[in-house]
């Protein structure tokens, strides 16, 4: 059972997990009381109690409630999923709405720098893609990385094609530019259990 909440008077989003629903509801009630003592309150639209976790799918199936809810947090959508061997796995996917917004922003910028030299455009797009991957390249998010890079390449090709009606850019030529300037999609971050297991000398 997950409790997702955010105080309404300041930005402090948080996700808290509980094994039992009764514990989650009791905590939520105590949190409301505690914040009320300081004239604060939880955001009514961002605070919710959802059934999520290893046994959520099985319990909801028995009750005829369908799949477990998903939730968004820090730019990712969290989903109850399974590995290829059928084991439970929490999957993280880049938020689709955030990705679309980022692509729209890049489209506008590409149009503004349409007539700049291709190497200058390539360098800029390299840092755009690398920056996106540095945050989003987590396990279970490979498809989103591929999709982001592909959409960047498509928008870049459109800009390069439009800036000169005489020069047509075929996909073979475009592929050379893509391979030269756009970093390939690959997972950069370890699984959470591997990261949390790291110990540092004192």
Positions of predicted regions on the chain:
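Non-catalytic terminal/accessory segments
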Residues: 1-202
